[in-house]
Design a protein with these regions (language model features):
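Residue-level detector of conserved, function-critical positions
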Residues: 33-535
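Short, conserved catalytic or interaction motifs in soluble domains
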Residues: 27
Length: 535
């Protein structure tokens, strides 16, 4: 029999009716006009709306770095924050969609803060009379009071609230909840990490057995308890493409020392429980693929969790680092000089590997074998994209490997003193560029963005004036742009788009040097303090 042990949260949020979303609330003004904030129509414009046409939400941090920033939809400004605003762009942890953003505002003349949730059109959807942090999972909005972030330290719980974003309905939450997780895409199961403060105690830090008084509750939307696990905590699994649908990582505490006795994979929809080897630990190894590894001897079991039930893919002597269809990379080797092993799952062939890396944009897995062969596997199909010999640099004492989209890779060689002696790029055709022998070396290079002609790199060298400036290179080492400040990429930007600063402007730029969106560094309300940077 199901038991209902829940109550609605102690605070009632004022919810804004947006197109019939909610039924009891007051209407808010347009999204942008806030104290010190700038409406989109008032924002200084140095660009064309058509230049950034992906129609997605993007957050450009304030140049000053402390509060502020700009929310874009494509190239259109939805919200330009004041220095006292803080913005959180909400990406659904399961679907990967980014359709909302949350702004915390200061109340003029007071130390109080309020929060407003906006949709992708800049319309206010919900408002709260206090600061909150938010997570969006499976269409459910999970809120925690900013003031309750450390509430667990004094035994206070119950600062978590959950709303169905489609209807605005607030769902029941346990009084003892510390947080909430959602792993099924329909949002039918709610997972709560909870803590019971023992009777007679006022503060959690006075509890000598805190871990043993934590527990996991799984409920339905009505608050009916479907599962309780004592002395346990729950966490989600995630790959470069987002969360694992329906699966949780459950960890049971060993005792009061917070040590973990064992972990297991649990399917909240089917109830399937995978325990693996004794004293196991859980790790994600690919899209919907996870490993259960023994803490005693590193033996591991690999599971495909993409279908309704788990499918065992293999058992191995070491922990699985990365999986692509057809092969795995293990953290361990019979060769003391090479820390990794590549195994072909069809033939069972083992290859010693000196370096391994996964490109989190594409999921491609790159390995540099002990005999200096570079292999790159497609993260989705497992197809071998690149299989070429690498030309080692004689002066190189250390080598690092970076996997890039479309079968490309970046190698960097360092001396015994960790000075860069060469940067190399490779594709399926072999070596594209090597900086070995150049009079002045870049100190490092990293992935910037992808284009129709292949990835681009941002490369930095120490300048005599101590300036922190970067160049933009293609994979053949050609210089496309030079001496840019704050040149880097953030998640979910379209191809051929990155963040840069040039002179007194910063924003989004493409590889031709064309601004897709830009602001003056002096447009930030905090610039009079001097300095600052763009994240």
């Amino acid at each position: 029999m199901k038991t209902t042990l829940l109550r609605l949260s102690r605070r009632a949020a004022c919810l804004v009716l947006a197109g019939g979303l909610l039924t009891s609330c007051s209407l808010l003004p347009a999204a942008s006009p806030r104290h010190e904030g700038t409406a989109s129509s008032q924002a200084p414009q140095y660009y064309s709306d058509a230049w950034l046409s992906d129609d997605s939400l993007h957050y450009v941090y304030s140049y000053a770095g402390n509060g502020g920033g700009t929310i874009l939809r494509g190239g259109r400004v939805l919200y330009k924050a004041s220095s006292s605003d803080s913005i959180q762009l909400l990406k659904d942890t399961l679907t990967g969609e980014t359709g909302h953003y949350l702004v915390a505002h200061s109340t003029p003349g007071t130390e109080e803060r309020t929060s407003t949730l906006y949709d992708a059109d800049g319309n206010a959807v919900m408002t709260f009379p206090y600061a909150v942090s938010a997570t969006l999972s499976g269409g459910l909005l999970i809120l925690n009071d900013a003031a309750d972030v450390w509430a667990f330290e004094n035994g206070t719980t119950g600062g978590t609230r959950v709303y169905d974003l489609a209807t605005g309905v607030q769902l029941p939450v346990p009084e003892t909840a510390l947080d909430c997780l959602v792993v099924d895409e329909d949002g039918q199961r709610l997972i709560f990490n909870c803590y019971d403060l023992p009777e007679g105690l006022t503060y959690a830090y006075d509890d000598p057995d805190q871990p043993l008084h934590q527990y996991v509750l799984i409920t339905d939307r009505e608050g009916n308890v479907l599962l309780r696990e004592d002395g346990c905590t729950a966490s989600t699994l995630a790959s470069y493409r987002g969360g694992f649908a329906d699966w949780l990582d459950l960890s049971w505490f060993r005792g009061a020392d917070w040590g973990i006795a064992r972990e297991a994979l649990y399917n909240v929809t089917t109830g399937e429980l995978l325990t693996g080897e004794e004293d196991s630990a859980v790790s994600a190894c690919g899209v919907g693929v996870a490993c259960l590894q023994s803490r005693q001897d590193s033996r591991s079991v690999l599971y495909d969790l993409n279908s309704g039930e788990a499918v065992e893919l293999g058992r191995f002597d070491w922990c699985v680092m990365d999986y692509t269809p057809g092969c795995v990379t293990l953290l361990g080797s019979d060769d003391p000089d090479n820390p990794y092993t590549l195994i072909d799952l069809a033939s069972g062939e083992k290859t010693a590997v000196q370096r391994s890396d996964t490109d989190y944009h594409s999921g491609n897995v790159a390995v540099l074998t002990a005999n200096n062969v570079l292999k790159i596997y497609d993260g989705t199909t497992g197809a071998l994209l690149t299989d070429v010999e690498v030309t080692p640099v004689e002066e190189g004492h250390y080598v690092s490997l970076t996997a890039l989209p479309d079968g490309y890779a970046l190698l960097q060689y360092n001396s015994e003193n960790y000075d860069t002696v060469a940067i190399q790029t490779y594709s399926g055709d072999g070596l594209l560029w090597s900086s070995a022998g150049e009079a002045q070396q870049y100190t490092y290079a990293s992935y910037l963005t992808n284009t129709a002609n292949g990835p681009l790199l941002t490369a930095h060298r120490d300048n005599s004036d101590s300036s922190n400036l970067s160049d933009v290179l293609d994979m053949e080492g050609n210089l496309l742009l030079r001496r840019l400040g704050s040149c880097y990429s953030i998640d979910d930007l379209p191809d051929d788009c990155f963040i840069a600063r040039q002179g007194f402007d910063y924003g989004l730029m493409d590889s031709t040097g064309q601004w897709l969106y830009r602001e003056s560094i002096f447009s930030s309300p905090s610039d009079d303090a001097g300095g600052g940077y763009l994240y």
